[in-house]
Amino acid sequence: MARIIYKNECEGQNRLECIEGIEIDLLNGQKALIYPKYSNEELLDLKDRDRWLDAGISETRALRLRDNQAATAALLEAGSPAARFVTKFSSERLGRFGLPTLLAAMEITEQEGEIDKLAREIDGADLLEDFCFSVWSCSRYYKYYGWVAYGSGGCARSNYLDTECMAVPLVLLDTTADGVA
């Protein structure tokens, strides 16, 4: 179930500057905090693909990934426009946002309606429905491809690194700390 997480002393103030983000549950028991500002971006220009030292991984390994910060940092170092966009945002309590794991990206596409319903209540928030229906993950598939959640098909697939897909700022939460509430 999605819910708005407010900054300290801002409960009920539905302006972008008063929220930490929108929290969603993931299939693996984790929670994720999404900042509702999005952009259609390339994951990586093909001329920079060799700067991303990450080896490609299988869909299963990408779905098992439980941390997005190191992968986002590697993409940022390689010159990723998508990583550059998402890392512009940070949470007072949780630090810098990153690109979603593949599982988180799939949950975003699955929970789009619920997320957008909450985003409509927040002044200044973007709606997922206004952007590309594929969401970049922080995982590489192969030399020229990255993993995306393909929203209209409800599945994961690979996409060329230089294709514009949605970059969604996200922080994975420590479930042992009961989210951020």
Each model region followed by its residue ranges:
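Extracellular adhesion/carbohydrate-recognition regions
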Residues: M1-R93, E164-L170, D178
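An exposed tryptophan-centered "aromatic clamp" motif
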Residues: L75, G79, A83-G98, L102-L161, ...
